Every structure is written in structure tokens, then in C-alpha cells.
């Protein structure tokens, strides 16, 4: 019989041992109590987009079983729970009329989290744009930022007095590049200009949302969560080192530079000027948008070589031989430390949360194996 142990008492006293979810991934009940259609509802129903046409219609049924789920977290000794609010539950059409039953659900959820002694971290957007806003152009359209700010205000007026930690966006890169560049996630579009315009709308939306957070949840700490790339040159060649820095511009500084410096990387104007958005006065304000903390999602590094035949002259290559997860992702724990240090040094970030980290395996329940978790 195999016994595993995890001693959380060894962690610093201000370390929050937590778990995270996203509304569409766990809630189910997609048509319950007035919820509107999201881009993921549509994407999952588009033939060929999702393996075996799986969808989030039921998922973990968290919408109906949230009390049981919170009880399990308490039993595990979890200290913090990061959840997301589903925009289509609050504004079924993205803007206009509010659905009060959606607010009621998250009101009960937050109270339930607090009642069990957990610290709630609320993510305002985890990829589930209301479909009606996508039908009008989606994130590439400037006015979506204004609708997002109104949605954020509505949520914060109801929940803000009980939320110590608030996240504006989860993984801007995935929202923009997977949604509008390579089409691998909802809404499944493929256009570089739309991608960069979506990024600008999202960057502007973060600033507007931070204004609303300061106004309606003044006691909260607020930030953003990014799956920042640790870009490593595949060789020691100077051109590959340049390519690795360029990948950081392409995937990460597109969001980091506006957040902390109020501008976009110069390399993007040099390589793809035709795709870059118009910037109006006040769009990118690093004072108003400055986060209280930075949430980092880290899973694996990316390895890069120069490729002058491409508009952005680089190419991703396979990681060196070594251990991999069941998803084929390389396992490089030291990359987390390296990435944290890079971000600290480049942007003077003082407070981090590791908001996602881990690995996927084809696990099966084992009757001869168990874990003991020692909590503070």
C-alpha cells in the first residue's frame, strides 16, 4: 500500500493554498434561470471543433452541486478558491437587461465560500463572452470593453463587499490568439488583425474594469492572470536568442507592456504594422490599470528558433528530450522560478499569485494508495 503526504504547514503563513475553476468548465445548467448563450456554447456545437462534440451543458453540475463541492474543498484543507463569474448569467445578451437570478447564484456561492473559511478569488472573465456580443464582432470591437466594464460594475455592486481578491481576465493570450488567430478555441476565428484588435480591446477593458473595482470594491486587491510564456532559445545561436525575445513580444509583452508601460512593443510595429490597432488617448493607462498583484499560470516553456521566412521571424520547435505529461507537455519545474524572476526584474512586480500550475496524467483510482494532507 502506497502512502503519499503533503505538509502544507511548511509553507509561509501568507501563502494561499488554493484551487481554481472556470464557470463554463464546471457549472453546467447552461440554459437555467435565464443564462444566455456564450461563445463556448456555440463553439461546442460547431461540427469538428470539439472532440466527440463534448460540451459544458452539464459538466460537473456545479450550478446545482456547489455546496457539496465547497464541502469537499473544506475537507481537503483548501485555503482559497478561485472561481469565475459567467458573463452570460448576468447579462444574457452581453449588455442591456440584467438577469437577477444569475447574481443570486454568485451571491450564494460567495457566502458559501466564506462560511467554510475559504478566501474567494473572483475572476470576472474566463473566456465565456456572450454570443450576442460576438455576433456583433466580439473582442475586436471597441465597445465590448465598455460593455465589460458595465458587467464588472454590476457584479461588484452585488459581491464587491465580500471579495478580497479580484481578477479582471484569465489568460488574455488564449482569449485573443486561440480565439481569433489560430481558431483552436471559441469563437474559432483566424485573422491576425482581429487578434491584435481584440488584444487592444481587452487591454482597454482591463483599465476600465480596474476603475470600477476601485469604486465598488475599494477594500479588494485586484489584478490580472496571464499564462506568460517562458521563451527559451533552442540553440545558443544569437539569432535564436533574438527570436526568443521576439516571441515574448508577440505573446506576452502585447499585454504586459500596455499594462505596465502604456505602450505596445516596438517590434510589432516593425514586423506587422498593418495589424496593429488605433490607440486613443486614455486607452492604455498604466496608472489606472496597475494591478495590485500579478497572477501567473505556468505549465511549460516554449523553445524557439529564428525563421526569416515568416512574418514574425521565428518558429516553435519541440522541447529537448525529457519527461512529459500525458498531454505531451515537457516538465521543467525550474522554469517557474526563472519566469517569476524575469517578470519581477522587467516590470518591478512585487506581488505574485501562482494561479495555475500542474500536470495532466491518465490517473485512475487506486485502492492501495492514499494521500495525507497536513494543513496549518
Listing of model-derived features with the role each one plays in the protein:
Residues 51-65, 139-142:
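Active-site mouth loops of central-metabolism enzymes
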Residues 65-86, 289, 293, 346:
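Catalytic domains of carbohydrate-active enzymes, especially glycoside hydrolases
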Residues 85-98:
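Glycine-rich, proline-tolerant flexible connector loops at the mouths of alpha/beta enzymes
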Residues 61-68, 76, 85, 101-108, ...:
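Generic alpha-helix structural propensity
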Residues 2-50, 74, 93-95, 103-376:
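Active-site region of glycoside hydrolase catalytic domains
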Residues 14-16, 63, 80:
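A common structural microfeature
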Amino acid at each position: 500500500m502506497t502512502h503519499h503526504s503533503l505538509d502544507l504547514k511548511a509553507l509561509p503563513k501568507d501563502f494561499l493554498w488554493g484551487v481554481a475553476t472556470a464557470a463554463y468548465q464546471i457549472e453546467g445548467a447552461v440554459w437555467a434561470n435565464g443564462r444566455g448563450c456564450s461563445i463556448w456554447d456555440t463553439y461546442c456545437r460547431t461540427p469538428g471543433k470539439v472532440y466527440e462534440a463534448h460540451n459544458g451543458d452539464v459538466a460537473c453540475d456545479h450550478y446545482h452541486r456547489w455546496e457539496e463541492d465547497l464541502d469537499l474543498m473544506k475537507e481537503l484543507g483548501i485555503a482559497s478558491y478561485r472561481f469565475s463569474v459567467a458573463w452570460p448569467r448576468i447579462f444574457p445578451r452581453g449588455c442591456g437587461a440584467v438577469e437577477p437570478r444569475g447574481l443570486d447564484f454568485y451571491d450564494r456561492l460567495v457566502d458559501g465560500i466564506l462560511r467554510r473559511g475559504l478566501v474567494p478569488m473572483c475572476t470576472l472573465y474566463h473566456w465565456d463572452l456572450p454570443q450576442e456580443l460576438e455576433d456583433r464582432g466580439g473582442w475586436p470591437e471597441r465597445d465590448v470593453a465598455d460593455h465589460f466594464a458595465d458587467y464588472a460594475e454590476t457584479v461588484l455592486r452585488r459581491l464587491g463587499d465580500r471579495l478580497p481578491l479580484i481578477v479582471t481576465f484569465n489568460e488574455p493570450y488564449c482569449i485573443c490568439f486561440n480565439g481569433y488567430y489560430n481558431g483552436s478555441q471559441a469563437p474559432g476565428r483566424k485573422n491576425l488583425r482581429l487578434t491584435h484588435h481584440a488584444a487592444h480591446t481587452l487591454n482597454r477593458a482591463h483599465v476600465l474594469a480596474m476603475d470600477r473595482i476601485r469604486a465598488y470594491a475599494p477594500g479588494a486587491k485586484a489584478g490580472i492572470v496571464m499564462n506568460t510564456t517562458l521563451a527559451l532559445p533552442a540553440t545558443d545561436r544569437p539569432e535564436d536568442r533574438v527570436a526568443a525575445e521576439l516571441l515574448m513580444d508577440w505573446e506576452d509583452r502585447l499585454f504586459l507592456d500596455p499594462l505596465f508601460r502604456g505602450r505596445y512593443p516596438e517590434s510589432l510595429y516593425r514586423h506587422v504594422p498593418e495589424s496593429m490597432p488605433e490607440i486613443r488617448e486614455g486607452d492604455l493607462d498604466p496608472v489606472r490599470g496597475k494591478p495590485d498583484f500579478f497572477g501567473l499560470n505556468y505549465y511549460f516553456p516554449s523553445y524557439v528558433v529564428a525563421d526569416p521566412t515568416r512574418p514574425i521571424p521565428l518558429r516553435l520547435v519541440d522541447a529537448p528530450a525529457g519527461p512529459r505529461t500525458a498531454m505531451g507537455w515537457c516538465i521543467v519545474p525550474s522554469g517557474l522560478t526563472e519566469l517569476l524572476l524575469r517578470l519581477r526584474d522587467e516590470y518591478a512586480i512585487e506581488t505574485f499569485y501562482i494561479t495555475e500550475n500542474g500536470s495532466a496524467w491518465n490517473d485512475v483510482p487506486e485502492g492501495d494508495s492514499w494521500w495525507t494532507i497536513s494543513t496549518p
